[in-house]
């Protein structure tokens, strides 16, 4: 298991994180965990085959941490990513955005060569 703690602000000379979990996303996850009533929950991000572009992102709550999970902690909230999914996500940013189309979690993935209009599928 690999654990990365995300600082509130990056310090100069710091190594880039494998995956950024923004404060906005962490705050939304914290409120959802509170609604669930289980403080042991963590948000799991995974990549699976499918979608119109070949791969798709998925989110689920999980209270278990596997040996091959990477954990990223922002403001006390944990994001889990398994090692298979992580290979498609280095340098990606998990964010939560409020826009005209509504509110949603968004993954900004520099490894995606193309994405679907819905934003949940991509190709590499």
From Swiss-Prot:
Organism: Paraburkholderia xenovorans (strain LB400)
Highest taxon of the lineage: Bacteria
GO biological process per UniProt: iron-sulfur cluster assembly
Quaternary structure, from the entry: Homodimer.
Gene3D superfamilies in the record: HesB-like domain (2.60.300.12)
InterPro entries attached to this UniProt entry: FeS_biogenesis, FeS_cluster_insertion, FeS_cluster_insertion_CS, FeS_cluster_insertion_RrpA, HesB-like_dom_sf
UniProt function note: Required for insertion of 4Fe-4S clusters.
Cofactor: iron-sulfur cluster
Residues engaged in binding iron-sulfur cluster: 52, 116, 118
Gene Ontology cellular component list: cytosol
Molecular function per GO: 2 iron, 2 sulfur cluster binding; 4 iron, 4 sulfur cluster binding; iron ion binding
Family affiliation: Belongs to the HesB/IscA family.
PANTHER family hit by this protein: IRON-SULFUR CLUSTER ASSEMBLY 2 HOMOLOG, MITOCHONDRIAL
CC cofactor note: Binds 1 iron-sulfur cluster per subunit.
HAMAP family listed in its UniProt record: Fe_S_insert_ErpA
Full protein name: Putative iron-sulfur cluster insertion protein ErpA 2
Alphabetized UniProt keyword annotations: Iron, Iron-sulfur, Metal-binding
């Amino acid at each position: 298991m690999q654990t990365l703690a995300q600082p509130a602000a990056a310090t100069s000379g710091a190594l880039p994180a494998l995956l950024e979990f923004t404060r906005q996303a962490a705050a939304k996850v914290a409120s959802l965990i509170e609604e669930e009533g289980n403080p042991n929950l963590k948000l799991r991000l995974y990549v699976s085959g499918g979608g119109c572009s070949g791969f798709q992102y998925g989110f689920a709550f999980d209270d278990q941490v596997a040996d091959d999970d990477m954990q990223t902690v922002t403001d006390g909230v944990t994001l889990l990513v398994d090692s298979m999914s992580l290979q498609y996500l280095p340098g990606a940013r998990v964010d939560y955005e409020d826009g005209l189309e509504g509110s949603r979690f968004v993954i900004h993935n520099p490894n995606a060569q193309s994405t679907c209009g819905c934003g949940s599928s991509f190709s590499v």
